[in-house]
Design a protein with these regions (language model features):
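Active-site loop/lid in soluble adenylation, ligation, and acyl-transfer enzymes
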Residues: 1-55, 142, 181, 187-207, ...
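Active-site cofactor/substrate anionic-group-binding motifs, chiefly glycine-
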Residues: 55-79
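Residues forming anionic-ligand binding surfaces in small-molecule and nucleic-acid pockets
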Residues: 74-94, 175-194
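Contiguous, small/hydrophobic- and glycine-enriched helical/loop subdomains that border
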Residues: 86-127
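A generic structural motif
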Residues: 93-99, 161, 192-200, 288-292
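Internal, well-ordered alpha/beta segment that forms a basic, Gly-enriched binding/recognition surface
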Residues: 121-126, 130-185
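Short beta-strand elements
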Residues: 141-143, 155-157, 263, 270-290
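A hydrophobic, small-residue-rich beta->alpha segment in the mid-to-C-terminal subdomain
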Residues: 174, 178-195, 277-299
Length: 299
């Protein structure tokens, strides 16, 4: 498995939109003889699921006040807040695409690594989460792109939970379905569960430990790296500017509608909003934290 990190001219890039653009660019243009791993951490960011309505998922006043980045990813699932207290493990898998949709198998390398580091109570739970003593410490998403699985998951070492609680506005039905009253009550952190010798590690050290465990190597220096060229980085910058830093992609048009219906289904939350003019449906939008195999506009 190749390792690709957001390192440019020796500098670690902590811009979450750049990290996302890098992964998508590689998926579209770089084809190697093995799978690819993209580990990264970034500045405070809210990542929105492909099919979600950003306007109802985030506290925009809090985002503006604290300069938190909002980026929409290409995979489904729900909104997540991450910062430099979380490691994001993304990947491109083409050696065995039968894993698509099977989050238990997808998570196995991470679970094994966390258990080795002392967090032996971490388990795969629900549709696409990892939990520690009943609290969520990771959420995963994946999609099929170019006949390859593109996906990833966050690992919450110890993020800013106050910011997480204030910036996200999760669907009340989703929260109620889990028997909890707030985001903070639902989310845990991994640091306290690690073996004592790892509890004071930095986020960089945690990232490297996870990478070495997943790749089965003793030192991060042993990883098989793929280095992006200057031309690659220029294309990544362009993609980030045109898409992942573009308001139309991240927010889009979120007008008010006359009718709204939200339901919590086995596949996730589905929110349908309809505008009616002269007794005819003028517009219909479908949002949610579900995982789709196509584009909503095709429905």
């Amino acid at each position: 498995m190749y390792l690709i990190e957001p390192i440019r001219n020796g500098e670690y890039i902590t811009d979450g939109a750049i990290a996302l653009a890098m992964q998508v660019y590689v998926n579209q243009h770089i084809f190697l003889d093995e799978d690819i791993l993209f580990p990264y951490y970034c500045d405070p960011k809210v990542e929105i699921g492909r099919f979600q309505n950003t306007a109802i998922e985030v506290n925009q006043d809090y985002i503006d006040k604290h300069s938190i980045q909002v980026v929409r990813r290409d995979t489904g699932g729900g909104a997540v807040y991450v910062d430099k207290g979380a490691v994001n493990m993304c990947c491109i898998l083409e050696q065995d695409t039968s894993i698509y949709g099977d989050f238990q198998r997808f998570y196995q390398p991470a679970i094994k690594a966390l258990h080795t580091l002392g967090a032996t109570d971490v388990v795969q739970s629900g549709r696409n989460d990892l939990t520690l003593n009943g609290k969520k410490v990771s959420g995963a998403a994946m999609t099929l792109m170019n006949n390859r699985i593109y996906g990833g998951y966050s690992l919450l070492l110890d993020v800013n939970y106050e910011a997480m609680d204030k910036v996200l506005k999760p669907n009340r039905k989703k929260i109620a379905s889990k028997g909890i009253k707030s985001v903070r009550a639902r989310v845990g952190h991994l640091r306290e569960a690690l073996d004592e010798k790892y509890r004071d590690i930095t986020i960089e050290e945690f990232k490297n430990l996870m990478v070495t465990q997943i790749l089965g190597i003793d030192d991060i220096k042993e990883a098989k790296r793929y280095e992006l060229s200057d031309a690659d980085w220029e294309a990544i910058d362009e993609l980030a500017d045109k898409k992942y830093k573009n308001w139309d992609w991240n927010y889009g048009k979120s007008p008010k509608y006359e009718y709204n219906r939200s339901e919590r289904l086995s596949s996730g939350t589905v929110d349908i909003t309809i505008s009616v003019e002269q007794n005819r449906i003028a517009d219909c939008r479908i949002f949610g934290d579900f995982f789709g195999q196509g584009d909503i506009k095709d429905v």
